[in-house]
Amino acid sequence: MLDKFDNLFHAARTGDISLLQKLLNDQIEINIQDNRGYTPLIIACYNGQTEAASKLMEAQADVNAQDFGGNTALMGVSFKGYADIAEMLIAHGADLNMQHGNGGTALMFASLFGRNELVKILLKHGADTSIRDKRGLTALDLAIQQGNEPAIEMLQLL
């Protein structure tokens, strides 16, 4: 059984769609977590595997699953800058305002790392700009710290 799960994580990480489809057809448990709490969906999203992420979402993967640090797939793509995957996650019900262990949100990641297309997408879909992390900082505060002028402008318009 472990081999199937190793294969599932491999298919998600590398975008091996034929292997992924075979495993999905076998009705494998798709919300299994590895030793860091990553699910196949989190792995696919973090690695920019759009088609694999789409297949997993179609198979009802939990879009709000959190790893052991509290990070979600949406947080991962907001950090990495994968706008197309972010839109898919949101369309499948991803919670825009979930917070990880330190209180950060997807919007905070996008603001902090200059992923301004993601800032725009998250704001368009109603991300809460008033959420504060454990240090008391908002997405705007983080954008200011980084000198991220486009994000500052978008966040100040609200």
Tell where the protein language model's regions lie, with residue ranges.
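Conserved ankyrin/ankyrin-like repeat signature
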Residues: L19, E51-A52, D84-I85, E117-L118, ...
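Ankyrin-repeat-protein effector appendages
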Residues: M1-H10, T14, H92, H125-D128, ...
